[in-house]
From Swiss-Prot:
The keyword Zinc does not apply. This is Killer cell immunoglobulin-like receptor 3DL1. It comes from the Eukaryota. SMART domains: IG. GO terms for biological process: immune response; immune response-regulating signaling pathway; natural killer cell mediated cytotoxicity. Belongs to the immunoglobulin superfamily. Residues 22-340 are extracellular.
Length: 444
Protein backbone atom coordinates (compact mmCIF):
# COMPACT_ATOMS: atom_id res chain seq x y z
CA UNK A 1 0.00 0.00 0.00
CA UNK A 2 2.72 2.39 0.94
CA UNK A 3 4.61 1.52 -2.23
CA UNK A 4 1.55 2.41 -4.29
CA UNK A 5 1.18 5.76 -2.54
CA UNK A 6 4.80 6.62 -3.19
CA UNK A 7 4.47 5.65 -6.84
CA UNK A 8 1.39 7.79 -7.32
CA UNK A 9 3.10 10.75 -5.67
CA UNK A 10 6.05 10.47 -8.02
CA UNK A 11 3.77 10.28 -11.05
CA UNK A 12 1.84 13.32 -9.84
CA UNK A 13 5.00 15.33 -9.33
CA UNK A 14 6.19 14.36 -12.79
CA UNK A 15 2.91 15.47 -14.35
CA UNK A 16 3.02 18.80 -12.52
CA UNK A 17 6.54 19.41 -13.76
CA UNK A 18 5.45 18.50 -17.28
CA UNK A 19 2.41 20.74 -17.15
CA UNK A 20 4.27 23.72 -15.77
CA UNK A 21 6.04 24.72 -18.98
CA UNK A 22 2.94 24.22 -21.08
CA UNK A 23 0.72 26.18 -18.74
CA UNK A 24 3.15 29.01 -18.22
CA UNK A 25 3.89 28.02 -14.66
CA UNK A 26 6.30 29.49 -12.17
CA UNK A 27 9.46 28.71 -14.19
CA UNK A 28 9.76 32.38 -15.09
CA UNK A 29 13.12 33.29 -16.67
CA UNK A 30 15.00 36.57 -16.27
CA UNK A 31 15.80 38.81 -19.24
CA UNK A 32 18.69 41.31 -19.13
CA UNK A 33 20.34 43.77 -21.51
CA UNK A 34 24.11 44.19 -21.63
CA UNK A 35 25.87 46.59 -21.35
CA UNK A 36 22.76 48.76 -21.03
CA UNK A 37 19.16 48.96 -22.16
CA UNK A 38 19.82 52.56 -23.26
CA UNK A 39 21.53 52.17 -26.62
CA UNK A 40 22.76 54.84 -29.06
CA UNK A 41 21.50 54.53 -32.61
CA UNK A 42 24.03 52.45 -34.52
CA UNK A 43 25.32 50.81 -31.32
CA UNK A 44 24.84 47.28 -30.03
CA UNK A 45 23.15 45.48 -27.13
CA UNK A 46 23.01 41.83 -26.07
CA UNK A 47 19.79 40.30 -24.66
CA UNK A 48 20.23 37.29 -22.37
CA UNK A 49 17.50 35.00 -21.05
CA UNK A 50 18.47 33.44 -17.67
CA UNK A 51 16.90 30.63 -15.69
CA UNK A 52 17.94 28.55 -12.70
CA UNK A 53 17.97 25.55 -15.05
CA UNK A 54 19.90 26.10 -18.24
CA UNK A 55 17.73 26.60 -21.32
CA UNK A 56 18.77 25.08 -24.62
CA UNK A 57 16.83 27.67 -26.58
CA UNK A 58 14.74 30.78 -26.07
CA UNK A 59 12.54 33.09 -28.08
CA UNK A 60 12.17 36.87 -27.94
CA UNK A 61 8.86 38.69 -28.03
CA UNK A 62 8.28 42.37 -28.73
CA UNK A 63 5.35 44.02 -26.98
CA UNK A 64 4.12 46.12 -29.89
CA UNK A 65 4.24 43.00 -32.12
CA UNK A 66 6.18 44.88 -34.76
CA UNK A 67 8.15 42.00 -36.21
CA UNK A 68 11.78 42.65 -36.92
CA UNK A 69 12.86 40.30 -39.74
CA UNK A 70 15.70 38.76 -37.72
CA UNK A 71 13.22 37.73 -34.97
CA UNK A 72 10.59 36.08 -37.13
CA UNK A 73 10.42 32.32 -36.64
CA UNK A 74 13.87 32.07 -35.06
CA UNK A 75 15.01 30.30 -31.92
CA UNK A 76 18.13 31.59 -30.18
CA UNK A 77 20.64 29.96 -27.90
CA UNK A 78 21.70 31.71 -24.68
CA UNK A 79 21.85 35.27 -26.01
CA UNK A 80 21.00 37.50 -28.91
CA UNK A 81 23.12 40.42 -30.12
CA UNK A 82 21.39 43.43 -31.70
CA UNK A 83 23.79 45.30 -33.97
CA UNK A 84 23.58 47.86 -35.42
CA UNK A 85 20.63 49.14 -33.42
CA UNK A 86 18.01 51.19 -35.26
CA UNK A 87 14.83 52.93 -34.14
CA UNK A 88 12.91 49.76 -35.11
CA UNK A 89 14.62 47.92 -32.23
CA UNK A 90 13.19 50.33 -29.63
CA UNK A 91 10.47 48.73 -27.54
CA UNK A 92 9.48 46.34 -24.74
CA UNK A 93 10.88 42.78 -24.84
CA UNK A 94 10.23 39.49 -23.01
CA UNK A 95 11.64 36.00 -23.50
CA UNK A 96 10.53 32.39 -23.05
CA UNK A 97 12.86 29.45 -22.56
CA UNK A 98 12.55 25.78 -23.46
CA UNK A 99 13.45 22.90 -21.11
CA UNK A 100 16.09 20.36 -22.17
CA UNK A 101 13.70 17.47 -21.56
CA UNK A 102 10.74 19.18 -23.19
CA UNK A 103 11.71 20.79 -26.51
CA UNK A 104 8.10 21.66 -27.32
CA UNK A 105 7.32 23.19 -23.92
CA UNK A 106 8.08 26.86 -23.23
CA UNK A 107 8.33 28.70 -19.95
CA UNK A 108 6.23 31.58 -18.72
CA UNK A 109 7.21 35.01 -20.11
CA UNK A 110 10.15 36.74 -18.45
CA UNK A 111 10.30 40.16 -16.91
CA UNK A 112 10.01 42.97 -19.49
CA UNK A 113 13.11 44.84 -20.67
CA UNK A 114 12.68 48.18 -22.44
CA UNK A 115 15.25 48.92 -25.15
CA UNK A 116 15.58 52.69 -25.64
CA UNK A 117 17.36 54.01 -28.71
CA UNK A 118 19.00 57.42 -28.32
CA UNK A 119 20.10 60.10 -30.77
CA UNK A 120 16.76 61.07 -32.31
CA UNK A 121 16.51 64.66 -30.96
CA UNK A 122 18.86 67.43 -29.82
CA UNK A 123 20.39 66.82 -26.40
CA UNK A 124 18.92 68.45 -23.25
CA UNK A 125 20.90 70.03 -20.40
CA UNK A 126 21.52 68.53 -16.96
CA UNK A 127 22.20 70.59 -13.81
CA UNK A 128 22.69 69.76 -10.12
CA UNK A 129 21.14 71.87 -7.35
CA UNK A 130 22.73 73.04 -5.14
CA UNK A 131 25.81 71.42 -6.70
CA UNK A 132 27.45 68.14 -7.81
CA UNK A 133 29.37 67.73 -4.52
CA UNK A 134 26.88 66.29 -2.05
CA UNK A 135 27.56 65.58 1.61
CA UNK A 136 26.76 62.05 2.74
CA UNK A 137 23.11 61.80 3.87
CA UNK A 138 21.94 64.93 2.05
CA UNK A 139 19.86 65.20 -1.12
CA UNK A 140 20.51 66.71 -4.55
CA UNK A 141 18.13 67.74 -7.33
CA UNK A 142 19.14 66.84 -10.89
CA UNK A 143 17.25 69.07 -13.31
CA UNK A 144 16.93 68.02 -16.95
CA UNK A 145 15.61 70.73 -19.28
CA UNK A 146 15.36 71.64 -22.96
CA UNK A 147 13.78 74.21 -25.25
CA UNK A 148 12.28 71.24 -27.12
CA UNK A 149 8.87 70.45 -25.66
CA UNK A 150 9.63 66.92 -24.44
CA UNK A 151 6.72 65.12 -22.75
CA UNK A 152 9.01 62.81 -20.76
CA UNK A 153 12.53 62.96 -19.36
CA UNK A 154 14.75 60.01 -18.44
CA UNK A 155 17.68 60.00 -16.02
CA UNK A 156 20.27 57.26 -16.41
CA UNK A 157 23.33 56.41 -14.34
CA UNK A 158 26.32 54.89 -16.10
CA UNK A 159 27.25 51.34 -15.19
CA UNK A 160 23.80 50.04 -14.27
CA UNK A 161 21.50 47.94 -16.45
CA UNK A 162 18.21 48.84 -14.75
CA UNK A 163 15.69 51.01 -16.54
CA UNK A 164 16.32 54.75 -16.25
CA UNK A 165 14.17 56.91 -14.00
CA UNK A 166 11.30 58.57 -15.82
CA UNK A 167 9.39 61.79 -15.13
CA UNK A 168 6.78 63.82 -16.98
CA UNK A 169 8.14 67.11 -18.29
CA UNK A 170 6.76 70.38 -16.94
CA UNK A 171 6.57 73.36 -19.31
CA UNK A 172 7.54 76.71 -17.82
CA UNK A 173 8.84 79.94 -19.43
CA UNK A 174 9.19 78.32 -22.82
CA UNK A 175 11.23 75.31 -21.67
CA UNK A 176 10.33 71.77 -20.67
CA UNK A 177 12.01 70.36 -17.56
CA UNK A 178 11.89 67.68 -14.88
CA UNK A 179 13.49 67.58 -11.41
CA UNK A 180 14.89 64.23 -10.24
CA UNK A 181 15.48 64.01 -6.48
CA UNK A 182 18.51 61.89 -5.53
CA UNK A 183 19.18 60.88 -1.95
CA UNK A 184 19.82 60.50 0.86
CA UNK A 185 23.25 60.52 -0.74
CA UNK A 186 25.39 57.41 -0.40
CA UNK A 187 28.17 55.82 -2.41
CA UNK A 188 25.74 53.67 -4.41
CA UNK A 189 24.05 56.83 -5.76
CA UNK A 190 27.27 58.62 -6.71
CA UNK A 191 28.48 58.36 -10.29
CA UNK A 192 28.05 59.80 -13.78
CA UNK A 193 24.56 60.76 -14.87
CA UNK A 194 23.01 61.70 -18.21
CA UNK A 195 19.45 62.62 -19.12
CA UNK A 196 17.29 62.24 -22.21
CA UNK A 197 13.99 63.54 -23.55
CA UNK A 198 11.22 61.89 -25.58
CA UNK A 199 7.91 62.77 -27.20
CA UNK A 200 4.62 60.93 -26.69
CA UNK A 201 4.23 59.22 -30.07
CA UNK A 202 7.72 57.63 -29.86
CA UNK A 203 8.28 57.02 -26.13
CA UNK A 204 11.22 54.62 -26.61
CA UNK A 205 13.08 56.82 -29.10
CA UNK A 206 15.06 59.23 -26.97
CA UNK A 207 17.08 62.36 -27.64
CA UNK A 208 20.85 62.48 -27.69
CA UNK A 209 22.30 62.24 -24.17
CA UNK A 210 23.03 65.37 -22.18
CA UNK A 211 26.60 66.18 -21.25
CA UNK A 212 27.77 63.88 -18.42
CA UNK A 213 27.40 65.13 -14.86
CA UNK A 214 29.50 63.59 -12.08
CA UNK A 215 27.74 63.40 -8.70
CA UNK A 216 30.23 62.98 -5.85
CA UNK A 217 29.51 62.07 -2.23
CA UNK A 218 31.75 63.84 0.30
CA UNK A 219 32.44 63.28 3.98
CA UNK A 220 33.54 59.67 4.58
CA UNK A 221 37.22 60.58 5.11
CA UNK A 222 39.11 63.21 7.08
CA UNK A 223 39.69 66.56 5.45
CA UNK A 224 43.09 67.55 4.00
CA UNK A 225 44.79 70.92 4.52
CA UNK A 226 45.18 73.63 1.90
CA UNK A 227 47.92 76.29 1.81
CA UNK A 228 49.21 78.89 -0.64
CA UNK A 229 52.81 79.53 -1.68
CA UNK A 230 54.23 82.14 -1.20
CA UNK A 231 51.08 83.11 0.74
CA UNK A 232 47.36 83.86 0.46
CA UNK A 233 48.04 87.57 -0.15
CA UNK A 234 50.08 88.26 -3.27
CA UNK A 235 50.87 91.12 -5.60
CA UNK A 236 49.23 91.24 -9.01
CA UNK A 237 51.27 89.20 -11.49
CA UNK A 238 53.03 87.14 -8.81
CA UNK A 239 52.93 83.33 -9.28
CA UNK A 240 50.76 81.35 -6.84
CA UNK A 241 50.75 77.63 -6.01
CA UNK A 242 48.09 75.93 -3.86
CA UNK A 243 49.25 72.83 -1.95
CA UNK A 244 46.78 70.19 -0.73
CA UNK A 245 48.22 67.66 1.73
CA UNK A 246 47.24 65.05 4.31
CA UNK A 247 48.69 62.18 6.31
CA UNK A 248 46.01 59.93 4.78
CA UNK A 249 47.32 58.05 1.76
CA UNK A 250 44.99 59.64 -0.77
CA UNK A 251 45.61 58.74 -4.41
CA UNK A 252 44.11 61.90 -5.87
CA UNK A 253 43.47 65.48 -4.79
CA UNK A 254 40.74 67.72 -6.18
CA UNK A 255 40.80 71.53 -6.10
CA UNK A 256 37.58 73.51 -6.43
CA UNK A 257 36.79 77.21 -6.41
CA UNK A 258 33.59 78.81 -5.15
CA UNK A 259 31.47 79.74 -8.14
CA UNK A 260 33.51 77.55 -10.49
CA UNK A 261 31.77 74.93 -12.61
CA UNK A 262 34.69 72.52 -12.75
CA UNK A 263 37.37 71.12 -10.49
CA UNK A 264 41.02 70.39 -11.11
CA UNK A 265 42.64 67.11 -10.06
CA UNK A 266 46.22 65.95 -9.55
CA UNK A 267 47.72 62.68 -8.26
CA UNK A 268 49.10 62.73 -4.72
CA UNK A 269 52.87 62.48 -4.19
CA UNK A 270 54.37 61.07 -1.02
CA UNK A 271 56.73 63.52 0.71
CA UNK A 272 59.68 62.86 3.05
CA UNK A 273 57.60 63.96 6.04
CA UNK A 274 55.19 61.06 5.33
CA UNK A 275 52.46 63.28 3.98
CA UNK A 276 50.72 62.93 0.63
CA UNK A 277 50.60 66.18 -1.30
CA UNK A 278 49.62 67.72 -4.63
CA UNK A 279 50.71 71.18 -5.81
CA UNK A 280 48.33 73.12 -8.05
CA UNK A 281 50.12 75.96 -9.92
CA UNK A 282 47.71 78.79 -10.68
CA UNK A 283 50.18 80.97 -12.56
CA UNK A 284 50.52 84.76 -12.24
CA UNK A 285 47.91 86.17 -9.87
CA UNK A 286 45.36 88.47 -11.46
CA UNK A 287 42.26 88.00 -9.28
CA UNK A 288 41.21 86.61 -5.92
CA UNK A 289 39.02 83.66 -4.94
CA UNK A 290 38.04 81.11 -2.27
CA UNK A 291 39.36 77.56 -2.71
CA UNK A 292 38.86 74.14 -1.10
CA UNK A 293 40.46 70.77 -1.77
CA UNK A 294 39.37 67.14 -1.34
CA UNK A 295 41.10 63.77 -1.25
CA UNK A 296 39.96 60.50 -2.86
CA UNK A 297 41.12 56.92 -3.39
CA UNK A 298 41.65 55.19 -6.70
CA UNK A 299 39.19 52.39 -5.98
CA UNK A 300 36.36 54.85 -5.23
CA UNK A 301 36.66 57.92 -7.51
CA UNK A 302 33.17 59.26 -6.66
CA UNK A 303 33.73 59.22 -2.90
CA UNK A 304 35.72 62.19 -1.59
CA UNK A 305 36.86 63.36 1.79
CA UNK A 306 35.43 66.24 3.75
CA UNK A 307 36.48 69.56 2.19
CA UNK A 308 39.51 71.38 3.53
CA UNK A 309 39.06 74.64 5.37
CA UNK A 310 38.37 77.43 2.86
CA UNK A 311 41.41 79.39 1.68
CA UNK A 312 40.88 82.97 0.53
CA UNK A 313 43.48 84.12 -1.99
CA UNK A 314 43.56 87.91 -2.37
CA UNK A 315 45.49 89.97 -4.90
CA UNK A 316 46.70 93.50 -4.12
CA UNK A 317 47.19 96.13 -6.79
CA UNK A 318 44.29 94.84 -8.85
CA UNK A 319 40.71 96.14 -8.63
CA UNK A 320 39.20 92.82 -9.74
CA UNK A 321 37.51 90.84 -7.02
CA UNK A 322 37.33 87.25 -8.26
CA UNK A 323 39.78 84.75 -9.67
CA UNK A 324 38.88 82.49 -12.60
CA UNK A 325 38.63 78.78 -11.93
CA UNK A 326 41.90 76.85 -12.44
CA UNK A 327 40.36 75.13 -15.44
CA UNK A 328 39.01 78.34 -16.96
CA UNK A 329 41.11 80.64 -19.17
CA UNK A 330 42.34 83.94 -17.80
CA UNK A 331 40.10 86.92 -18.31
CA UNK A 332 42.94 88.69 -20.12
CA UNK A 333 42.51 86.36 -23.04
CA UNK A 334 38.99 87.76 -23.42
CA UNK A 335 35.88 86.26 -24.82
CA UNK A 336 36.12 86.11 -28.64
CA UNK A 337 32.43 86.87 -28.98
CA UNK A 338 32.68 89.93 -26.74
CA UNK A 339 35.81 91.04 -28.60
CA UNK A 340 33.97 90.89 -31.93
CA UNK A 341 31.08 92.89 -30.48
CA UNK A 342 33.50 95.53 -29.15
CA UNK A 343 35.28 95.84 -32.50
CA UNK A 344 31.99 96.10 -34.39
CA UNK A 345 30.67 98.78 -32.04
CA UNK A 346 33.89 100.80 -32.37
CA UNK A 347 33.72 100.67 -36.17
CA UNK A 348 30.09 101.85 -36.16
CA UNK A 349 30.93 104.76 -33.83
CA UNK A 350 33.89 105.84 -35.99
CA UNK A 351 31.80 105.71 -39.17
CA UNK A 352 29.04 107.74 -37.47
CA UNK A 353 31.54 110.42 -36.41
CA UNK A 354 32.98 110.63 -39.94
CA UNK A 355 29.49 110.92 -41.43
CA UNK A 356 28.56 113.64 -38.95
CA UNK A 357 31.74 115.58 -39.76
CA UNK A 358 31.06 115.29 -43.50
CA UNK A 359 27.47 116.52 -43.14
CA UNK A 360 28.60 119.45 -40.95
CA UNK A 361 31.26 120.42 -43.46
CA UNK A 362 28.76 120.22 -46.32
CA UNK A 363 26.25 122.34 -44.38
CA UNK A 364 28.84 125.04 -43.66
CA UNK A 365 29.96 125.14 -47.30
CA UNK A 366 26.39 125.49 -48.58
CA UNK A 367 25.66 128.24 -46.07
CA UNK A 368 28.78 130.19 -47.10
CA UNK A 369 28.00 129.88 -50.81
CA UNK A 370 24.42 130.97 -50.23
CA UNK A 371 25.59 134.07 -48.38
CA UNK A 372 27.92 135.03 -51.23
CA UNK A 373 25.28 134.49 -53.92
CA UNK A 374 22.73 136.56 -51.97
CA UNK A 375 24.93 139.69 -52.14
CA UNK A 376 23.61 142.32 -54.63
CA UNK A 377 26.05 143.32 -57.43
CA UNK A 378 26.99 146.78 -56.27
CA UNK A 379 28.92 148.88 -58.70
CA UNK A 380 30.20 151.11 -55.91
CA UNK A 381 31.65 148.39 -53.67
CA UNK A 382 35.11 147.73 -52.55
CA UNK A 383 36.79 144.38 -52.66
CA UNK A 384 36.28 142.17 -49.62
CA UNK A 385 38.75 142.76 -46.89
CA UNK A 386 39.45 139.05 -46.83
CA UNK A 387 40.83 139.35 -50.37
CA UNK A 388 43.34 141.86 -49.16
CA UNK A 389 44.32 139.61 -46.27
CA UNK A 390 45.14 136.81 -48.67
CA UNK A 391 47.55 138.94 -50.69
CA UNK A 392 51.22 139.59 -50.15
CA UNK A 393 52.44 140.92 -46.81
CA UNK A 394 52.53 144.44 -48.35
CA UNK A 395 49.03 145.84 -48.21
CA UNK A 396 47.68 146.86 -51.61
CA UNK A 397 44.70 149.13 -52.18
CA UNK A 398 42.50 148.74 -55.23
CA UNK A 399 40.41 151.46 -56.84
CA UNK A 400 37.49 150.83 -59.07
CA UNK A 401 37.81 152.94 -62.25
CA UNK A 402 35.07 153.11 -64.80
CA UNK A 403 35.83 153.35 -68.49
CA UNK A 404 39.55 153.54 -67.89
CA UNK A 405 42.13 151.68 -69.82
CA UNK A 406 45.09 150.22 -67.99
CA UNK A 407 47.41 147.38 -68.58
CA UNK A 408 46.55 145.77 -65.26
CA UNK A 409 45.01 142.28 -65.00
CA UNK A 410 41.26 141.86 -65.22
CA UNK A 411 39.78 140.19 -62.13
CA UNK A 412 36.47 138.48 -62.02
CA UNK A 413 35.71 136.21 -59.06
CA UNK A 414 34.40 132.80 -60.04
CA UNK A 415 31.82 132.87 -57.27
CA UNK A 416 30.41 136.20 -58.47
CA UNK A 417 30.61 135.51 -62.20
CA UNK A 418 27.08 135.90 -63.70
CA UNK A 419 25.72 133.47 -66.20
CA UNK A 420 25.53 136.25 -68.92
CA UNK A 421 28.54 138.47 -69.55
CA UNK A 422 28.10 141.97 -68.06
CA UNK A 423 28.00 144.99 -70.31
CA UNK A 424 30.42 146.98 -68.18
CA UNK A 425 33.98 146.06 -67.53
CA UNK A 426 35.52 146.74 -64.16
CA UNK A 427 39.28 147.17 -63.91
CA UNK A 428 41.34 147.30 -60.76
CA UNK A 429 44.72 149.01 -60.38
CA UNK A 430 47.17 149.27 -57.54
CA UNK A 431 47.69 152.63 -55.85
CA UNK A 432 51.04 152.45 -54.10
CA UNK A 433 50.67 155.81 -52.39
CA UNK A 434 47.35 154.95 -50.73
CA UNK A 435 47.16 154.36 -47.03
CA UNK A 436 46.96 150.77 -45.80
CA UNK A 437 43.47 149.31 -45.91
CA UNK A 438 42.08 152.56 -47.43
CA UNK A 439 39.46 152.34 -50.13
CA UNK A 440 39.45 154.64 -53.19
CA UNK A 441 36.31 154.70 -55.22
CA UNK A 442 35.97 156.24 -58.66
CA UNK A 443 32.46 157.22 -59.50
CA UNK A 444 31.29 157.35 -63.11
Amino acid sequence: MSLMVVSMACVGLFLVQRAGPHMGGQDKPFLSAWPSAVVPRGGHVTLRCHYRHRFNNFMLYKEDRIHIPIFHGRIFQESFNMSPVTTAHAGNYTCRGSHPHSPTGWSAPSNPVVIMVTGNHRKPSLLAHPGPLVKSGERVILQCWSDIMFEHFFLHKEGISKDPSRLVGQIHDGVSKANFSIGPMMLALAGTYRCYGSVTHTPYQLSAPSDPLDIVVTGPYEKPSLSAQPGPKVQAGESVTLSCSSRSSYDMYHLSREGGAHERRLPAVRKVNRTFQADFPLGPATHGGTYRCFGSFRHSPYEWSDPSDPLLVSVTGNPSSSWPSPTEPSSKSGNPRHLHILIGTSVVIILFILLLFFLLHLWCSNKKNAAVMDQEPAGNRTANSEDSDEQDPEEVTYAQLDHCVFTQRKITRPSQRPKTPPTDTILYTELPNAKPRSKVVSCP
